[in-house]
A protein has these predicted regions:
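Active-site-proximal alpha-helical segments within enzyme catalytic domains
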Residues: 199-206, 244-267, 318-335
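Active-site Gly/Thr loop motif
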Residues: 231, 279-330
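Structured C-terminal helix/loop/strand segments within mature extracytoplasmic catalytic/sensor domains
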Residues: 314-385
Length: 516
């Protein structure tokens, strides 16, 4: 079991549940009872050998810690035993899975090898790009293989470790593939793990070079189609190559399908979608990832935990966890700040795995199931609370227009409108109105252009007066990990605004003054 489990363990839960962590259960044998191509069948946890009471404790812990989870799905023996969404998310909302995209790219490379598009993992990367003039070229760079890309051991100088501060420079470049190929080497290929989303992007470029279609098109034909997965968008680089290491959107149910495919050795309803030997090889440790925040092993774009499960992991807390010896798939989508990134794995080890009691059904426990349903409702955060009376400042600033000083966000004007006894307010930025819930419930807003951050998704917003002169707005672009808090501090003729992005904690300070 990895050190990070112990580091991030919930202390009270350890004491209460430590004995349950020793439980083991054999997976279900034989052919799955059905295939969820058209949709998941649901079941109580007890019907699939799991203890609802432990899952109730998990949701209690999530609420107490206030983890910024967007969804939690648990599949046992092929049945969806737990499905929870935090509003405004639901089962139909595609979520940016960030670096879970890497595991999808890995599957597509395996399929491409099986179909003969790629000769094998030993094929040299530069062979796919013969027309490119590559900087810093030497024999070591010429020796980089597809396997080196798959195992994050290409040797490219890619500073910053798992958080990859180089990504900004990379994505601002005119040609993302060329940027990676031109990087000097810091290590001989195959010798050291260095997390590198650019290397994963080269895998997508290789797919497009060899198949003649984009990774998304290849996936729709060979992976998503057979599983009944309907992907959201998949961002592309300036040359139209789907980003190999991030920015694919899937619903949590479709994320679970992908995990279930791997749980079943790449086989789906009689079709070998991903070669079985590729699944086995991909989810086997090829290199240690020590010293780069994550301490366990790495396969072919999959994280391998010493406890016996493997994971696709994405920025902000996107998880697809496959636990073969429990016949279990677990999915989390999130907007977790960096310090809480491992919270889903803590929840897995503290509550979900101990909930697996048997490979056979347990005795019914309707009271615990009812408590679990109540916990899922609480998790949704859709219950409105009473709206406190407005402070005098709200009446004073309502309807006033403020002009921003020059700022990096490009904002020019701000207006707020409040009404006594209303459960919403309106915040208008640069002429775009946002309805903001004042009763702790988010309100959804379509925006004609990116307004907060660089996402063009609908924005969910809620707000509250923190004091007589300070109003805070939580803004969540729906479908991405990032969320934002705007803290507005008013005085007689101006407002000072602190804008904070909640995953990284980075922020900006702005000032706006009343228009004369």
């Amino acid at each position: 079991m990895s050190y990070r489990f112990w580091r991030w363990m919930l202390p009270v839960a350890v004491i209460v549940l430590a004995s349950g962590m020793l439980d083991t259960s054999a997976p279900a044998q034989g052919t799955p009872p059905y295939w969820p191509t058209e949709g998941w069948r649901v079941s109580t946890p007890e019907e699939q050998g799991m203890d609802s009471a432990r899952l109730v404790a998990m949701f209690d812990a999530v609420e107490k810690a206030d983890y910024a989870l967007h969804s939690v799905l648990i599949v046992r023996h092929g049945y969806l035993v737990t499905e929870a969404y935090r509003y405004p998310y639901d089962q139909a909302t595609p979520h940016d899975v960030r670096s879970c995209t890497k595991s999808v790219i890995s599957a597509l490379i395996g399929i491409a090898i099986q179909q003969g598009h790629v000769a094998g993992v030993d094929q040299r990367v530069l062979d796919f790009f013969p027309e490119r003039a590559v900087a810093n070229l030497d024999d070591a760079k010429r020796s980089i293989t597809v396997e080196n890309l798959l195992t994050m051991s290409s040797g490219f100088d890619w500073p910053g470790g798992i958080l990859e501060p180089i990504l900004g420079e990379w994505t601002r470049s005119d040609n993302w593939v060329q940027f990676v190929l031109d990087r000097p080497l810091a290590d001989p290929p195959g010798t050291r793990f260095v997390y590198n989303t650019g290397g994963s992007h080269l895998l997508s470029a290789i797919l497009q070079e060899t198949t003649g279609v984009t990774a998304l098109e290849f996936a729709q034909q060979n992976l998503f189609g057979p599983l009944g997965i309907s992907p959201g968008r998949w961002e592309s680089d300036p040359q139209g190559i789907n980003v190999g290491g991030a920015w694919l959107r899937l619903t949590p149910r479709d994320m679970a399908k992908f995990g279930y495919l791997y749980l079943n050795g790449g086989q789906w309803d009689g079709q070998q979608v991903v070669p079985a030997d590729w699944v086995a090889t991909s989810t086997h440790e090829h290199i240690r990832a020590g010293g780069q925040w994550l301490s366990d092993g790495y396969g072919y774009q999959w994280w391998i935990d010493q406890a016996g499960y493997y994971m696709a992991l994405g920025y902000g807390g996107q998880y697809i966890v496959v636990v073969p010896d429990r016949d279990l798939v677990v999915v989390f989508t999130s907007g977790l700040p960096t310090q809480d990134f491992f919270a889903p794995e803590t929840l897995l080890n503290t509550f979900i795995l101990p909930a697996v009691q048997s490979s056979a059904p347990l005795s019914p426990n309707p009271a615990a199931v009812a408590d679990l349903e109540a916990g899922i409702r609480t998790f949704a955060h859709r219950e409105a609370s009473a709206v406190p009376p407005l402070p005098e400042t709200a009446r004073r600033v309502s309807g006033q227009v403020y002009a921003f000083d020059p700022n990096d966000e490009g904002w020019e004007s701000l207006r707020l409108d409040f009404a006594d006894e209303a459960d919403t307010a309106q915040v208008t930025l640069d002429g775009i109105p946002l309805t903001v819930g004042l009763d702790r419930v988010f309100r959804l807003n379509d925006t004609p252009r990116p307004l907060i951050g660089y996402w063009d998704d609908p924005v969910a917003a809620r707000g509250a007066w923190k004091s007589d002169a300070v109003f805070a707005v939580d803004a969540q672009p729906v479908g991405v990990p990032e969320s934002y808090t705007l803290t507005l501090a008013f005085d007689s003729a101006e407002v000072r605004i602190r804008l904070r992005e909640n995953v990284t904690g980075r922020g900006d300070s702005l000032k706006a003054s009343l228009r004369g």
